[in-house]
């Protein structure tokens, strides 16, 4: 099998191409009109390789077990979005069932990265239902942002917290630890965070 991907950002495909090394020696191609809307896009295709075929044929649980930090970062670059005001992340896993989101994706993120991902339903006007993962600012959003910062991709810098927000978050953690309030409610954490923000 081959690995094929596309993106509106050429820099991101170059990042992936560098990771693929000898598996991908071709050029990044520009397509002037792509899809229904006819928007421009960049594409990248690897060589055929048995390792790609092997990974492609794995079940979801086995694929998750192969993921490292970089793999999770790419997952959020590809399918994640950050709410800039409320500082939570959505991971767009709507292609998968409620059961896969609940029983595979959420436990994996919790056990490996202490990211608490809540399966959330999206109901369409025509009655269709889709599930995705939501990660609140108090339950793993900081960890996601820090993970993305380990593997920076300039066009996607908007998917990470600002340095000021990260600094404020670290101050919150220090205060919670010093006052033995690490297990307090998210509402209480929000109040403390607001106070710290006002004092800066």
At which residue positions do the language-model features occur?
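Internal intein/HINT superfamily modules and their associated LAGLIDADG
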Residues: 1-200
